[in-house]
Swiss-Prot record:
Record PANTHER family: 2-AMINOETHYLPHOSPHONATE--PYRUVATE TRANSAMINASE
The organism of origin for this protein: Lactiplantibacillus plantarum (strain ATCC BAA-793 / NCIMB 8826 / WCFS1) (Lactobacillus plantarum)
List of residues that carry N6-(pyridoxal phosphate)lysine: 194
Protein known as: 2-aminoethylphosphonate--pyruvate transaminase
Catalytic function, reaction form: (2-aminoethyl)phosphonate + pyruvate = phosphonoacetaldehyde + L-alanine
Pfam families attached to this UniProt entry: Aminotran_5 (PF00266)
UniProt record similarity statement: Belongs to the class-V pyridoxal-phosphate-dependent aminotransferase family. PhnW subfamily.
Length: 366
């Protein structure tokens, strides 16, 4: 079946034909070959994230990226004598807060405007005001707008206060250079269908073993017990506790091969960045304003304001879709906007074609 359009979205995204082909065979979860693939993936993820395997482990978890976030929050934070600080500047930070609410976890939300990055100075001031804080969570690439938050500046602050750190790197790991060894974070979460360019079906959590080892019995959920999942994968390498998405795992294994063939994370970041820059410059030339300052813009997805009050996004969307691309509606709460992603099997040639299509639309609606 021919793919009718490219996804210019933050994931699920457009994948290569070879990633799709990897899902054409059925696999047995107990088979040694399959378990070898799973175990290899776990080690490759550590290498991709520059995480020392003597200190860190990768835990794979069935479900979407949010399953991974919920499992981490629900396992990392003890049932008593713990308070979670959440730095929020978009919908995915608010989702962490929702998880804390569901689990009755005491939490302090430090909320920023959606068009501003998390400010380390304000975070440090909050820590000074709240000595009860034991854990910290934030989103690296907040795809509500496309902001890339300054995790490199935040982690040293947390270390000074002995805070356990949780980074939602759903839309950055694999597409933005990250060194977990340098960050020295406790948990970093991502998903198969983001910058590694696999398909949806599982999340993965890179966890500091010394921290995770103290989380037994913390989990509020059987299926989302990160500690128990880790123990199962450690005692029986390649084994998941419950039925794993076998086809998705093989697609991800192929996607990792292709990431290496591209040269690794840095060349992929450069491709994403080139596409984002072309998109940003091109749409501004066509009359669309950016939602956020380019200084805090990441390469994953870009938000644009509606050009005027009469702009019909539904009509705009269909015009573009009929010509081979799918984009995203806006998620900023108080600014009418739309979003366009620049990750996946997409390059500047595709972005230039999109700009031509949008230029044609603008000509028709002058």
């Amino acid at each position: 079946m021919k793919q009718p359009y490219l996804l210019l979205t933050p994931g699920p995204l457009s994948t290569t034909a070879s990633v799709k082909d990897a899902m054409q065979i059925d696999y047995c979860t107990w088979d040694s070959d399959y378990r070898h693939v799973t175990e290899t993936i776990r080690q490759q993820i550590l290498a991709m994230a520059q995480a020392n395997p003597e200190n860190y482990t990768t835990v794979l978890l069935q479900g979407s990226g949010s399953f991974g976030v919920e499992a981490t929050i629900g396992t990392a934070v003890p049932r008593t004598d713990a308070t979670l600080m959440i730095a929020i500047n978009g919908a995915y930070g608010h989702r962490i807060s929702q998880i804390a609410e569901y689990y009755d976890i005491p939490h302090i939300d430090v909320v920023f405007n959606e068009d501003e990055a998390v400010d380390p100075v304000r975070i440090e001031a909050t820590l000074a005001d709240h000595p009860e804080i034991t854990h910290f969570a934030t989103v690296h690439s907040e795809t509500t707008t496309g902001i890339l938050n300054p995790i490199e500046a935040l982690m040293p602050i947390m270390h000074e206060h002995g805070i356990v750190t949780i980074i939602d790197a759903m839309s950055s790991l694999g597409g933005v250079p990250i060194s977990i060894d340098e960050l020295d974070c406790d948990y970093l979460i991502s998903s198969a269908n983001k910058c590694v360019q696999g398909v949806p079906g599982f999340a993965f959590i890179i966890a500091k073993q010394a921290t995770l080892a103290h989380t037994a019995d913390n989990a509020r959920s059987l299926c989302l017990d990160l500690y128990d999942q880790w123990q199962a994968m450690t005692k029986q390498p390649g084994k998941w506790r419950f039925t794993s998405p076998t086809h998705v795992v093989h697609a991800f294994a192929q996607a990792l091969i292709e990431l290496q063939a591209e040269g690794g994370v840095t060349p992929r970041y450069q491709r994403y960045r080139a596409s984002q820059q072309l998109l940003s410059d091109g749409l501004q030339a066509l009359g669309f304003e950016l939602v956020i300052d380019p200084a805090i813009q990441g390469p994953i997805i870009t938000s644009f304001k509606y050009p005027n009050v009469d702009f019909d996004f539904a009509d705009f969307y269909q015009f573009i879709k009929q010509r081979g691309f799918v984009i995203y509606p806006g998620k900023v709460s108080n600014i009418p906007s739309f979003r366009i992603g620049t990750i996946g099997d997409v390059d500047t040639t595709d972005i230039q074609r999109l700009l031509t299509i949008i230029g044609d639309y603008q000509q028709l609606h002058r």
